[in-house]
Amino acid sequence: RDVALDGRREVNDAFRKTVAGTGSYDTIVPKFKALVDERDPNLDYYARGTFTSHNLDFAEDVLSIADAGFDRLSVEPVTADPGCGYDLTEDDLPKIEAEYDRLTDIMLERKKEGKPFTFFHFMVDLDQGPCVVKRLRGCGAGYEYVAVTPDGDIYPCHQFVGKEEYRMGNVFDGSFDMGISGQFAKQNIYTRPACRECWARFYCSGGCSASNLLVNGDISLSNEVACKMERKRLECAIALKAIAAGMGETENTSRNNTECNQCGFCQ
């Protein structure tokens, strides 16, 4: 459902290159646009990008994607090894938070101009939302789904691939470590110390285990930089909902949770 596009040509081509080593923007954008134009209009899609410390003005990349003809967008913070040169740090947060505020203003202005677009991280359901189980533990890595490599090795999700201590088994020999699965199944907003007192816990549902491991070496210890970005996005999302309500608007700016059937608890 997603097509990968990081925004402006120079931003995209810095990381997304062809096999020949050249930038991919001019090749992929016309193809992505044709794909989106021909899709079933009842099916969601997202033009999904990533921002790094090299493009903290990422609202410009959101606008670039929108101006390229896409109206369902997601530009997300990079997950990268600390110190790699493009990872996001605490020092970047003031610029990132200001950019989310700027993006909020841009979206309001675009709406007035009759050129609205959807930004995934600014979607929040204040009326219903997901079931209580999903509010307590949003990520199903390791127990609701797994990642399987071409060699058949099983990991909790794609971000754990190569981390031998989290290899759960192999599809070819039939092995599967239920102990690792149970370790992930026990994760929730009350087992993670930083989540317990966080006002955003029932919207965030505990964050990403892989991100926690990458930054803190423990899937239970929250990545505080990621947490601060999530809280800022939620502030912007709630502000947009409040402004829309004040204008008497009723259009949907919520993620669709009506078809959630992943965990089976509500069946």
Could you tell me what each predicted segment is?
Residues 151, 190-267:
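Radical SAM enzyme core and accessory elements
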Residues 10-29, 33, 37-141, 145:
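Radical SAM enzyme [4Fe-4S]-AdoMet core and its adjacent flexible, acidic
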Residues 1-9:
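Conserved SAM/AdoMet-binding glycine-rich loop
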Residues 4, 76, 201:
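Conserved residues at the C-terminal ends of beta-strands
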Residues 95-128, 158-205:
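C-terminal accessory region of radical SAM enzymes
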